[in-house]
């Protein structure tokens, strides 16, 4: 896989989080937004994966395409999403990280290996679960 583009964005509480901070972990990057129905539909699946593998080193970074901070925070809280969250709060067309990862539609997910390289992208549902299962069996 090619190296995952490096980025740093802001968390809801104003801290910075960079992808390189999570090196050494398998990282799932989930591009989503509070206004995206299919994204919210996929969350229970992402949540199940997180609950199963976080203790074994899986990290998830939700990169939100929201431009309204309050909507973003409410969606995180309502859906009970306890992993890392970041956003530029510039929306999909102006988010620099969306450009880096060629995000033109969401949800879009990337799996990044411990070495910082892209393992897979665009998996959802059962396919996503199977791929994560496989990575943790190795």
Model-derived features: positions:
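Structural microenvironment flanking redox-active thiols in thiol-disulfide oxidoreductases
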Residues: 41-79, 90-99
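Short active-site neighborhood of thiol/selenol oxidoreductases, capturing the structured segment around
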Residues: 18-40, 46
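Thiol/disulfide oxidoreductase modules built on the thioredoxin-like
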Residues: 79-81, 88-137
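Flexible loop/turn segments at secondary-structure boundaries
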Residues: 16-17, 35-38, 67-71, 93-95, ...
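N-terminal "domain-start" segment that seeds a small globular fold
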Residues: 1-20, 131, 137
